Amino acid sequence: MTVPEPRDTEVAVSAEASLRTAAPAETVLSRAYRALSVGIVSVVVLIAFEATAVGTAMPVAARELDGVSLYAFAFSGYFTTSLFGMVFSGQWSDRRGPLAPLTCGIASFALGLVLSGTAGAMWLFILGRAVQGLGGGLVVVALYVVVGRAYPERLRPAIMAAFAAGWVVPSVVGPLASGAVTEHLGWRWVFVGIPVLVVLPLALALPQIRSRAAGPVGGADAPASFDGRRIRLALAVSLGAGLLQYAAQDLRWVSLLPGAVGVALLVPAVLGLLPRGTYRAARGLPSVVLLRGVAAGSFVAAESFVPLMLVTQRGLSPTLAPGRAGSRTGNV
């Protein structure tokens, strides 16, 4: 047996290192992941655009549909159903894989957009918003599952950063673009224009999801039945939040009854779904969840009602209102 000389070993190590250096690092835009990355990030961008841009069109839509008194329900309808959609999507993805909840979520989101964009009455507009929320909740969680299954661990931070950018960019340009569309084409186009744009991202992403992320997340060990307790808790959160919103809109004494029922449903259900210690800001995940909830709630409240005030009370156009609303929100 011949023992390699030191110089031979050094040459072999040097050659191996040079090969590693020469090989290009795999990224989320490499050939193997390009179609999937572009497709799912585009879906996130479209959902983010609709979520951030709708506040600009809402004051005009509510005024034309004679539904300013129901204005808040157009937002609460979306968020309450999205809460249920997110929990149900997690259960569905664990047991059947992310493809089904993703496709159903996108279909529901598109249907809700069409319902809202073609609504002739405020109640139908709110129904469309609720369907949008259900679809949005299904999609968001399913996309996270896709990331966990389709990408290696070293690429997941990059695709999650792309998701974050997919929310940041529409939040900056979306309200202004929505205001211009509302002012020059009409508020309905803010809603009915999105379903057409989602076709191409779906065509890119779905074949890749089917080949890379199909099937139950747990494989053969995945639970066969849904977790009924969590689904009931999510439904209780949605119903409780809806009843509480209804009671807050009606200042008569009779509204105390639905308000009390809403609190009775909402508080225990939220305690059952959130990490233990969230309400006392316990160290770790509970405090993160609490702070994110407070920050998101404040931001959404400002983005929802400041444009309404600027359009109805200050006479600003839908194009100018987002800029003023954004500056006020940034100052807060």
Language model features: what each stretch is:
Residues 55-59, 144, 178, 307:
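Interfacial helix-capping/hinge residues at the ends of transmembrane alpha-helices
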